[in-house]
Amino acid sequence: MDTSSVGTLELTDQTPVLLGSTAMATSLTNVGNSFSGPPNPLVSRSSKFQNSSVEDDDDVVFIEPVQPPPSSAPLVADQRPITFTSSKNEELQGNDPKILPSSKELAPQKGSVSETIVIDDEEDMETNQGQEKSSSNFIERRPSETKNRTNDVDFSSSTFSRSKVNAGVSNSGITTEPDSEIQIANVTTLETGVSSVSDGQLESTDGRDMNLMITHVTSLHNTSLGDGSNGLQSSNFGVNIQTYTPSLTSQTKAGVGPFNPGRMNVAGDVFQNGESAPHHNPDSWISQSASFPRNQKQQGVDSLSPVASLPKQIFQPSNQQPTKPVKVTCANCKKPLQKGQTAYQRKGSAHLFCSTTCLSSFSHKPAPKKLCVMCKKDITTMKGTIVAQVDSSESFQEFCSTSCLSLYEDKQSPAKGALNKSRCTICGKLTEIRHEVSFKNMTHKLCSDHCFNRYRMANGLIMNCCEQCGEYLPSKGAGNNVLVVDGQQKRFCCQSCVTEYKQVGSHPSFLKEVRDHMQDSFLMQPEKYGKLTTCTGCRTQCRFFDMTQCIGPNGYMEPYCSTACMNSHKTKYAKSQSLGIICHFCKRNSLPQYQATMPDGKLYNFCNSSCVAKFQALSMQSSPNGQFVAPSDIQLKCNYCKNSFCSKPEILEWENKVHQFCSKTCSDDYKKLHCIVTYCEYCQEEKTLHETVNFSGVKRPFCSEGCKLLYKQDFARRLGLRCVTCNYCSQLCKKGATKELDGVVRDFCSEDCCKKFQEWYYKAARCDCCKSQGTLKERVQWRGEMKHFCDQHCLLRFYCQQNEPNMTTQKGPENLHYDQGCQTSRTKMTGSAPPPSPTPNKEMKNKAILCKPLTMTKATYCKPHMQTKSCQTDENWKTEYVPVPIPVPVYVPVPMHMYSQNIPVPTTVPVPVPVPVFLPAPLDSSEKIPATVEDLKSKVSSDPLDSELLTMTDMMTEEEGKAEASNINSVIIETDIIGSDLTKNSDPDIQSNMPDVPYEPDLDIEIDFPRAAEELDMENEFLLPPVFGEEYEEQPRPRSKKKGTKRKAVSGYQSHDDSSDNSECSFPFKYTYGVNAWKHWVKTRQLDEDLLVLDELKSSKSVKLKEDLLSHTTAELNYGLAHFVNEIRRPNGENYAPDSIYYLCLGIQEYLCGSNRKDNIFIDPGYQMFEQELNKILRSWQPSILPDGSIFSRVEEDYLWRIKQLGSHSPVALLNTLFYFNTKYFGLKTVEQHLRLSFGTVFRHWKKNPLTMENKACLRYQVSSLCGTDNEDKIATGKRKHEDDEPVFEQVENTANPSRCPVKMFECYLSKSPQNLNQRMDVFYLQPECSSSTDSPVWYTSTSLDRNTLENMLVRVLLVKDIYDKDNYELDEDTD
């Protein structure tokens, strides 16, 4: 964190008394420059801080005793003084005997010490300024202790009453009593855009919040001082604080969040923060921004604390106000700030901190979430919320929708009247009922959620509702969030509800509430919960409190000792009850007491007389003209209460679905439960849907019957005499057709309705269920169409078809003849009575009650007698194969394949047969054959790798035809060349895209590009790694020039004079040097015939390496390169330098890549032997300093990009790239420095170019964390702002070439690393995944690279010349 934003505050033992609270101390910290006068450098400091310059803009506040003038200043006669009065007197903390005197006692006292708060005005200034500066804000005075000019404002404690707000107070001047006043040196408003005060008026800013505003100032000294430079007369000022109830938006959480209290002047006008309004009264106000809980007051705190409410001012005489001690604590760690301790403060914040650690780690709490009062949903970011005042109370509640508001009002409405108390089914308490459950045609009343959950668990009921917010889950798949609590599965609508349920369930208050509920239930009915009760299942005596309740078959609650006992008893009872008889009305399994025979021959059973009476009443209501009609067997299911019924249903059409209900009550409850809300057509309010009526073919929704009637009146008034009611579809519409039938004129909405009505009237219309013609008694409106049915039976069948289509009920015109015949016969039998169902009459039989025939099933068990008897086919039933060798070709007669005949089956078995082959040889070489054989045997090496390679080479040698050679020695020497040609000719897959390099024996890279500083002494050389060498800064060197054109490779030797002229030229990268060096090394090994002197050379020659690099396998190339880096010599026989060997290996790698060879000799695990040998050689490299001060090396950065050693195409290449950039730009040239690097210390930063004003991203790293204790060796490789600042290393974004941008590489590295490692402070370089591919989302593991691997990487990076050029460039730039 930038230190410029941190202020300090030094506290004394009187600080709590002076400040009154933390808010008073902190709210004055950022005060100053609010009025248009120039900033005054008026800072009072202790003697040790005098004559010290302040370069930053920190808010530094010191509190110390200041000797006031000997006499108090008189008041101006024409000014109105206003004093700041607290509601309670404050007491000194501890054993301090000083008591705050009253204002009357303060007036005559002189010579005492007063406390002064000096606040920095947030401007860069010198404390020893001595020139006079005019101040228009406050009266100046010069204390004797300091030379600085200090402005003081008096907040004196005096007698103040509501009736004397506008009256002047004669004794409100500066007092001389200790601890009696707070004096402010300079005041600055917290708003940057506040206009200045002129002519005694303060202009409030529009749309902005100001934490402190001062509109009128009265002089604290005598009138001889005169007015300010801007014409504003200095005046006394004070505070008139009024309590204000915050708005609903600010009341999100008690005591948390910003709150701007209202501002009121003396005249009573209220101003909110940010509103623009003139001040009509010269008496002004001060408003302080703080957080206040709504309708709450914190006990014991009456100061202007940001966490306490503003109490109403009770103005009492100061002699009755005791002083109250207040502690100032750290806002982060809550530790009290001691006397003399330095406090830190952030600009614009009222919080104090004990240290910079607490200041940086402190963060404001997030804005609290707003929840819907009804469903508890998070509505913090939801738009369109509803704020309503419920139950005529002063509090406002916030809801997510109108449905929640309606449900909340319905929930609160029973509380207005008398409580409907009933006895709970579970606990038996006579209390208010919260739940009613209809189960098995009985309503069970439950008093609480606990009893409701126990009821659900006992009866196995599952509710599709969220356990937290109660939201309806339409299906089981909707509640995928399941939480198992105490063996029970609780379903939730979303993961946030699961989290809230866990937090509420784990809260101690929740657990205490459950325990208190259980304890209260036990205490209220001890005789019930303490007695022993017999379990219904196992008949065991248990306490009633531990019993599990369940509804039995008789509809009453039965106790069980456990859930297992309850389930076993239900299973047993279900088996015995399966043969029982079900009551036709209440559907209970009980012994029938009454039977009724219907006219159609059906017999119904009833359990008691009440069921018979209810059944008769229901049947008579549905019978036309009082005639009894037998109820139908078709049962509909109510969509709300889930009960079965056989009467005409109530229909609700909503969202292209038709819902059926058994009654109007269920329909209304369903609408409320599922929030079926729409805009009423009449009142234009969003309310629960009552009914939808068609008007002129358009559906109009209404919220009540009254709105529907009123809309009908308005509709009829608009149409006048043309408004009619259609006799067919019953809608109110404009007259469309008229028809006279039997002398009655009927009106219709259209010709179609008129035609359909005539068909119905003349009985020509068909039933929409059974498709039969005749009298259609029932009609309903289904999906906007009128449906007619024969009777209620067809109506119920039609509704069943809509729920579960049954093809047997779909009768088409093909049954017309049968239907007419049935109809005719029924008409003759019953006369004018309506025809019953077309189902045939059922055969009637007598039934005996309580008589059950005893039946027994007798079966004959026939067991066959088994006997085993051998036969011909039983023996040797498995086929046995016998090999019979038969020479081929030969004819083998095969008999006919019978079931008992074995036949031979030919099988081919290859057998190797040694065949001697004789090769001709010249007569002159026959004597050398034994010696050659012995020589070949001696070539066998003890090294397993050499033996394997020798075997492979011998196999290739046999294919090349060594017998055609003139002698054995020439065969051994020329085998490599012949094998290379054969391999290139026989393998068409390996096609070189790069031209072959001709062999040049005198080509030498160190001659073509010599080191220009070889004549320098060894003292100019230094050992690597040079960790921040200070010797570079002590001797400034000229800036390195731009690299010139690259010179071409030439043959032969050149003198050092010629090479020194071109020492600054960059070396061209040509792979021909590496390939030519390989060929030179292979030919040298082949021509060396002294095999007995060098054992290692003899073993290598047995591998028979070839000049063509592409003809070797990975193992051969690994072995050859390992020996190549150790044995390669210049054409003159001298050793190559380590950087030259690295250059040659890079050329070999480029040749392999250009020839479509995917091997990477520096990264692949197959070249581990070569990498170890190369690292040993590179460790001995010691760079030399050229005369121009640059470092000499033949390896450059561009070479590594060309051969893909750097880049983001693979995990290892990306890791090498980051390692190279950190070494180049951060100056990390030791392994210890790289190990100090971590994800937490490298961060992205935006840097602005002061010339082009262009922002560029960069990676920043602090030198102090990098160097540790190596301060004496550090150099500023990063840019510094000041010499005394710590240097900062940066890797600036490369916009010219994004593929080589350090910032892009770092972002790619973060994206391919595990996410949980981004802020770790102990790791930066991660181990690559062994099985990861380039398409994998994660390339690295959470394990850091070992030290050995980092050392090998550092050895290669330090040979690159560009890392030293980068250092020299930045050094020269800093010296400019």
Curated annotation (Swiss-Prot):
Low but widespread expression is detected in the developing kidney. A zinc finger (MYM-type) spans 326-362, 368-408, 420-455, 462-501, 532-569, 635-670, 722-757, 763-798. GO terms for cellular component: nucleus; PML body. InterPro entries: DUF3504, TRASH_dom, Znf_MYM, ZnF_MYMT-QRICH1. SMART domains: TRASH. Residues 1038-1049 have a biased composition (Basic residues). It is found in: Nucleus. The modification Phosphothreonine is found at residue 1375. Residues 30-56, 85-158, 269-304, 1027-1063 are annotated as: Disordered. GO terms for biological process: negative regulation of DNA-templated transcription. Can form homodimers. May be a component of a BHC histone deacetylase complex that contains HDAC1, HDAC2, HMG20B/BRAF35, KDM1A, RCOR1/CoREST, PHF21A/BHC80, ZMYM2, ZNF217, ZMYM3, GSE1 and GTF2I. Interacts with FOXP1 and FOXP2. This is Zinc finger MYM-type protein 2. It comes from Mus musculus. The gene is Zmym2.
